[in-house]
Design a protein with these regions (language model features):
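Catalytic center-proximal scaffold of phosphoryl-transfer enzymes
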Residues: 3, 18, 25, 46-47, ...
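Short, flexible loop/hinge motifs at secondary-structure junctions
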Residues: 1-182, 250-251, 257, 285-288, ...
């Protein structure tokens, strides 16, 4: 672009310089304003992210519509702020303020690739007209999604007749997951995962399918899920046997509203989870999660679920477990996360020297666990005896001394007494390298169920709770083993009807990983 000729007159030049100085100053002020706005927005995003994380921690395990509403508001605001950044870049990529570049992991190798060769439009050099020769190429990848599509599989069984007699031959009809049902195994797996993993009620799924021109009545898909629950019963029982054969089990439970028959009101059922997962102590045995439903929270249910189990039971301080520990074959290990949460809730309301100090000391215990994660049990026990035990002994003395200075009616006193009342179970993990510092392994398995409870509002009947527990068992175990639950259920629904019942263990997730190559996370 040619430069504008400068005038010869000195006064005119001075005026021009003055004008440009003023324009430059204005631009600097604009840049400063934009930088300030960007800083404010970046700070707001960081604050929103922290608040959302905090509310997520607070939301689990308690009923709070205020927290849910606040969380939704913050997430919506955060989405809007991030969307504004994307809109700014889309409108003017050059003028958009710089931001920290997102680093994404390479796309999985098993994803299909569609290569598009983009050739230059020029056939000859645009400057001199010379011939063009290959120089190299620039490659960029874009992630796209292809809409899942329905298809109809027509099984045509031809008949053949003997030319010499009346004999007719025909291949047997292929088995179906559901007798006289028209749903294929892939469709059944998709419906099950959409409901129990993605928390989409059947009526919402019906609306989604209707947009694609396929009418699937929720009553029909509901019957399919009932039939699938029966189909997978032997497999879920095998999973149960595998879990209770472990030397350590993590357990937890959560309420499940259930529609009471006759009066239209809801009662409170219970969903229990029992997890076998020793990977933190270096085990290569497959992790597994078995869920069970009960109509109430009576202690007889976990006693029945754990019949035949001997080992360490990591749980909260629920009194319903007490009878399990009586004969000594099952040893109680408590959860430091539960104990810490009671202190943290008080600390979040009002920071005090007591709550601050307790959280700091518990943080030291967790720091040691982070260092020994994945080590064999003997090494974990050695480090805990050397480093953790002195800290815990000192913490106990400090807590008991602190109680002498606190009101017996204070919330802090109650939280400290909660810890001291189960102190033996809390410190047990120091003496057993297989045990964990907390019960988060079980709590994590229940998070998805809590999301589903929020979407479904209630279960239709106790039988619905039992079906949900069965599906949660297979889906949760598939996830623990890094397997796509939909791919796993598709395989199960394809073969389980014809699979020998005495070899049902062959269909457990870790036994079919080689058959699901490309679908392991």
């Amino acid at each position: 672009m040619p430069s504008t000729p400068l005038p010869d007159d000195v006064e005119t030049l001075k005026a021009l310089l003055q004008q440009r100085d003023e324009e430059l100053q204005s631009l600097r002020q604009t840049v400063s304003t934009l930088e300030l706005a960007l800083s404010v927005r970046t700070l707001e995003i960081e604050q929103l992210t922290l608040q959302i994380a905090k509310l997520n921690r607070m939301m689990f395990g308690r009923k709070s519509e205020k927290i849910d509403k606040k969380l939704e508001q913050l997430e919506t605001r955060l989405e809007d702020l991030i969307a504004e950044e994307g809109a700014d870049e889309q409108i003017d990529p050059v003028a958009a303020p710089p931001r920290q570049k997102s680093v994404h992991k390479p796309f999985p190798e098993n994803l299909p690739r569609e290569e598009r060769i983009i050739e230059p439009q020029e056939d000859a050099c645009p400057q001199c007209g010379g011939n063009l020769k290959p120089l190299g190429e620039d490659v960029s990848e874009q992630l796209e999604i292809i809409e899942s599509a329905f298809k109809v599989i027509r099984n045509v069984r031809t008949k053949k007749a003997c030319a010499c007699c009346d004999c007719i031959v025909q291949a047997p009809a292929p088995s179906r997951p559901i007798q006289r049902g028209f749903a294929g195994p892939g469709l059944l797996a998709n419906i099950a995962v959409s409901k129990f993993a993605d928390h989409q009620p059947l009526y919402r799924q019906a609306m989604i399918h209707a947009r694609r021109g396929v009418e699937l009545d929720p009553a029909t898909t509901g019957r399919w899920m009932g039939a699938c629950g029966v189909l997978i019963t032997p497999l879920v029982e095998a999973l149960h046997r595998y879990v209770v054969a472990s030397g350590k089990i993590h357990t937890d439970d959560t309420p499940m509203p259930v529609l009471a028959p006759g009066n239209g009101k809801t009662k409170t059922g219970r969903l229990w989870v029992y997890v076998r997962d020793d990977r933190n102590s270096g085990s290569e045995e497959a992790p597994a999660a078995w869920f069970a439903y009960s109509a109430n929270r009576q202690g007889l249910h976990p006693q029945s679920h754990l019949a035949g189990f001997a080992g360490v039971l990591q749980a909260d301080a629920y009194a319903g477990y007490n009878k399990i520990f009586i004969d000594g074959s099952v040893i109680e290990a408590a959860c430091w996360a539960h104990a810490r949460r009671k202190i943290y809730d008080l600390h979040a309301k009002k920071v005090t020297p007591t709550t601050k100090e307790i959280l700091r000391r518990i943080g030291e215990l967790y720091a040691i666990e982070a260092q020994i994660r994945g080590q064999p049990p003997d090494e974990r026990k050695r480090i805990r005896q050397l480093q953790t035990r002195p800290l815990i002994d000192d913490l106990e003395v400090w807590l008991r001394n602190r109680l002498l200075t606190l009101s017996t009616q204070s919330e802090t006193t109650k939280a400290i007494n909660y810890m001291l009342n189960q102190w033996h179970a809390l410190i047990y993990y120091c003496d057993n390298g297989l045990a964990e510092i907390d019960n988060n392994i079980a709590e994590n398995q229940l998070r998805g169920c809590c999301l589903g409870r929020k979407n479904f509002l209630f279960l239709g009947a106790d039988s619905g709770g039992e079906r949900a527990a069965a599906m949660y068992s297979l889906i949760g175990t598939a996830k623990l083993n890094g397997i796509d639950p939909e791919a796993y259920l598709r395989y199960v629904f394809t073969y389980i009807a014809d699979h020998p019942i005495n070899r049902i263990d062959e269909l457990l997730p870790w036994n079919i990983t080689e058959k699901l190559v490309g679908q392991i996370h």
